[in-house]
Amino acid sequence: MYTSQDSSDFFSPVSFTVISVCLLLLFAVLSLFAPSPDIENDFIRSRLDDSDQHQSAFHVPASGGAYRHDLWNSTNSKLFSACSNAGVNFAKADSKTHPDRYLLIATSGGLNQQRTGIIDAVVAAYILNATLVIPELDHTSFWKDSSNFSELFDADWFIRFLRNDIRVIKQLPNMGEKFVNPHTVRVPRKCTPKCYEGRVLPLLVKKRAVRLTKFDYRLSNMLDDDLQKLRCRVNYHALKFTDSIQEMGKLLVERMRMKSKHFIALHLRFEPDMLAFSGCYYGGGEKERKELGEIRKRWKSLHASNPDKVRRHGRCPLTPEEVGLMLRALGFGIDTHLYVASGEIYGGEETLEPLRALFPNFHSKETLATKEELAPFMSFSSRMAALDYIVCDDSDVFVTNNNGNMAKILAGRRRYFGHKPTIRPNGKKLNPLFMKKDNMTWEEFASKVRTFQVGFMGEPNELRPGSGEFHENPTSCICQKSGSEVKTGGFSSPQNQTHEVDNKVENRTEKQPAEEDREWSELDYDLDIRKQVELKGTKIDSLPILLGTDQAEVQVFFSD
């Protein structure tokens, strides 16, 4: 049995020396197989670099790259021309206008919604063989603009340009000793020519003067080519803004041109109402859900929202950041100048900041003009919208994150006047892509964006003739040069050939979209476009819904 003394003898100096020598030999042998400190540090550094590279794989470049031959022009635009002149068999106003029929209309909504009503009013007057009284504009809805027709448009030019098509007068004339009070009626939406002949014509014959109220989308989208061409003559030629609006609009364009040879105009809709209506979710947590949920309650006809489903269907408006990423992927670099036409942005400057970072050359009418220059227009929402309309129309590239009236009308106008590039986001493809972007490289993302946007860039023949709203796709008024062949990623069937004249009336039926496929501009808004005026000191936002479902008219709130 060992004693404490035995233990101390065991750990003698000689024993320690032997153990130390063995340990040194062991470390020496191990060092032959171990990597040097430099190699180990390099390995660790490499692992860290790989981790950083993975985290920063989605690195947005400042340069747009050279993905397209020419970002600022459409490929086949020279192969097409506008062709909206009346055909040889189109009856002229002098021979068909009945001397005792007067049509009056009251438009509805904002500038561009009212524009569609004015265009269709001319066609309705032609169908009814009636004299059109200069349209009455909407002064009571959300936009609260008191402008009359002649304060927005050149009334004399309007009357003069259309003199061969219909007779237009500025006011209802005195018809004998008794003052004629127009009979007021509202026609159904998408009313066909036969509908007008059946519903309105008997009233005109009996009452002599008929006033059609809330006149927006009250005429069928599908008409024979002669009537569609009349629509084009009104929209693209007869409706001219007043000199003061045109001069200010052109001044804004000139100031953009002074900053850059080319520029993009972006019509950005990201207001709280639009987002609430869409049923989309943008990552703002409970605060966003509560705020937008309260606004959404204003529409009685809307079902409970399913944000994931809405996004999968491509129904969510792109955020300002997503618009910026799309443009960069399409080839527009950080030096591109951007004119932004927008209303209130949900989230304010914080929401706009990513777009500004991508495109710091960020302009608006408020930054291009002085307060004094804008003063004559500031109190009139339609006149301010008209300024944006002019700049967007004259831009080299027009981009929109929505499919409202202004976007549709400008898309059609740009097709008519030379197929100027017009970028409409392919939401059904882009929305899922944006959700996955953090799991891919920028190169992969940009390549997919360019692929998905084929057919959404404003090239000729992207849309099938007759598809969509006519104001967006005026194929009856655009002719392809005889014998020319279009090579495009869109729909490639040739449009009207210039050597062919076909006024055949097609027996077409308009397809009514399912609710989930309807545009923001087509669903019921039970507060009659909210009418956000103050009634006896109380904002309409705080009022209960007043209209029953049997009274509610489809109002286009999200279109301008």
Regions found by a protein language model. Name each.
Residues 1-560:
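N-terminal targeting/anchoring "stem" of glycan-biosynthesis enzymes
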